[in-house]
Regions:
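Terminal leader/tail segments of proteins
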Residues: 1-71, 77-149
Length: 149
């Protein structure tokens, strides 16, 4: 099923498949430095589903920006280059993860035109939230996700 999902994803012009958070990677590499940067909450989003779709794009001129996305200290998207083509990932968020989560967008580089900037779209069933972000080597933007009652 996983390979079929990947094939379907490639056919419609985006990458990646669903994953469950506990199977993700511990923070390694440059993203391991996330605690050394200031984290700035730029938006709070209330969600109702047990899975969310994350969609990443470069925001404006494609200049080589690369980000890692970290959910509650787990890398869920490692070192993803941003472009005008959507990068999509479905993440499962079981109730056992709690009702308040922090999604950090960690700049792995600044691209050729600082700062590192992009657009994150979070899809929660039929609800869609667009979050523009900017980060650099001193601060990382974060989205707070709160589960609806």
């Amino acid at each position: 099923v996983k390979n079929l999902t990947a094939v379907k994803a490639q056919q419609v012009g985006f990458e990646n498949t669903a994953s469950t958070i506990p199977n993700n990677q511990k923070i390694i590499g440059a993203a391991a430095q996330v605690a050394l940067r200031k984290t700035e909450a730029i938006r709070t989003i209330a969600f109702k589903s047990d899975s969310l779709t994350l969609v990443l794009y470069d925001n404006g001129i494609v200049d080589g920006d690369t980000v890692s996305v970290i959910l509650n200290d787990e890398v869920i998207i490692p070192k993803q280059g941003l472009s005008e083509q959507a990068y999509r990932k479905v993440i499962k968020i079981p109730p056992s993860m709690g009702d308040s989560l922090q999604l950090v967008i960690y700049a792995e580089n600044l691209g050729s035109i600082p700062p590192n900037s992009g657009l994150l779209i979070i899809e929660d069933g039929s609800d869609r939230y667009e979050v523009g972000f900017k980060g650099d080597m001193k601060k990382s933007p974060a989205v707070i996700l709160r589960r609806k009652g």
